[in-house]
Amino acid sequence: MGRNIQGPSMIRVPDWVENPLGDYYLYFADHRGEYIRMAYADEVTGPWTVYSPGTLKLEDSFFPTSCPPCSLAPGRTAALYAHIASPDVHVREDLGQIVMYVHGRDVGQQFTRLAISTDGINFEGR
């Protein structure tokens, strides 16, 4: 699952989601992760079940999947790595969407990208 888990973001699953896995979805990631993880529960206090195989994958996020190109930072000496992490998830009731902001590396810098879902599991990177 990873050694550097961070960036948890929890939502109450909207009523318009068909066949939800639970009443709450908790999104998180390993900072060197290749996908955003998700756990679900019917109560905020759990028990939580980790959804496998995860939700948004690095290759679907529009971030590079290998370095370079993400290691092109001028003067950079530390190793860089392709990743997707730090999900920040919001329910857009007005649009019937679940919106996820994530960060990753591209051309040597950290960037934030957006992904959209109607079910909280299958996200489309933008």
Model regions: which residues?
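Beta-rich carbohydrate-recognition and catalytic domains
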Residues: 1-85, 90-126
